[in-house]
Amino acid sequence: MKKSGFTFIFVSGALDELPDSGITEVMGTEETIQPSSRNETEPTLFAVPASDPQEPPPPGQPRLRRAERQQVVMQVASLDSLLPEDHRARVVWQYVQGLDLSKLYSQVRAVAGGAGRDATDPKILMALWLYATLEGVGSARQLAKLCADHVAYRWICGGVSVNYHTLSDFRTAHPALLDELLTHSVAALMHEGLVTLQRVAQDGMRVRASAGASSFRRRASLEQCQQEADQQVQALRQELEEDPGTSTRRRQAARQRAAQERSERVMKALGELAQIESKKTVEKKKKARASTTDPQARVMKMADGGFRPAHNVQFATDTASQVITGVAVVNAGSDEGQMPPMVQQHQDRYGKSPQEVLVDGGFAQLQDIDKVSSPAVGTTVYAPLQKPRKEGRDPYQPLPGDIATIAAWRRRMGTPEAKEIYKQRAATAECVNAISRNRGLRQFLVRGLEKVRTVALWFAIAHNLMRAVALRAPAALAVVGG
């Protein structure tokens, strides 16, 4: 991949058919126009006040530079010269250049001396998705189009063509590697003293699933769908075996794969339905439904008060640096029970648990607070208390049946220091959630918890990349200034 070689461009035709970065300067023709005959006192199209009617017009006809799109243009340029030195795409590429992607290179089957076309460099695909995530691009088709039209994406590609199938497959094909990258990137910041895990804020955000409300069906309907899907697969298989035409066989094979995938999704939906029914009471089991599109999605109450198919994305963020330190995705509609797994995730990733964790009332379950605050874990919980049922009772005074960890939590939350510390929760967790939404984390375009979590990891790594740049900037300036 070369970004610095000179390219000679000789163009004849319409300039508006070229990419944005294809032309740097265009000569136009000078024409004269007749003054407008409309009333000069009328407001102009863009609300610019008209000339003073008493002011005499300048002598001669006005001269304007008019657009000329049929002019032949020659340009000598390189991709590297088209991208500013301080562009964010360069930051992303520099980060990817320092990653250990040996696991991806070991999976490349195209080798020197062997048959087949060359594989796309994994660094290009990694950089494309990181930069696209920062720019709010979540569609593989849209990203593939940008790789042909937009100078920043073209610079990352460096002349390598990338199709949307390759981009789509790469995005969800390596969840273990992305998980490892998150751990290593945060560990590097911890080694530099930029992240301490002294205080971590956790929050969940409900993100729309790639499924419609009409895809949720009850058991009887799912069983009927399963039967119809199996029959369709058998019919297409028989049709494929009987038709000798190559092109027709190719189309029929695609139809058979689609039918087989639908049959598998319906089967998964039946399995998920059994789990849903096991959590419901007897009278509510008949109302249990599962999606045939994304069986692992659940109908959740969204921020606007509506109910839609969604996944619950959990981010844990270091309050001092706003670096995402933990990622989890569940299909539970509430945040109950999500604090202990996240604390354990930090122990598994970094060999230490957060000293303090800040959560909202949805996480404040007594058994979870006790588990996290136990001497074996040693994490201090800051979470709001529920309003007491008995009027006039001080909520910060321990109840007679409280164990030591719960009593300490109640007393702690009544202190001015705890109330001041808890203010950091919204400033950290809510801020990271808002940034993720601004970058496009509003609806998933993939299905299944594993793929959804993989996409969430892309957001976390991209976010941490920019936070690392900001955190290291003062040290870099000190070195330059010193």
Annotated model-derived regions:
Residues 78, 124-130, 166, 184:
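A general alpha-helix detector
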Residues 2, 8-49, 54-60, 65-66, ...:
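Anion-binding and metal-coordination hotspots
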Residues 65-74, 82-86:
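N- or domain-start disorder-to-order transition segments that initiate the globular core
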Residues 79-83, 419-420:
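Short, charged, low-complexity loops and linkers
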Residues 78, 86-87, 91, 121, ...:
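Secondary-structure junction/capping motif
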Residues 83-130, 135:
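Basic, short loop/linker segments at the boundary and entry of helix-turn-helix/winged-helix-like folds
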Residues 78-81, 100, 218:
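Short, solvent-exposed coil/turn linker segments
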Residues 99-103, 150, 154, 439:
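A short secondary-structure junction motif
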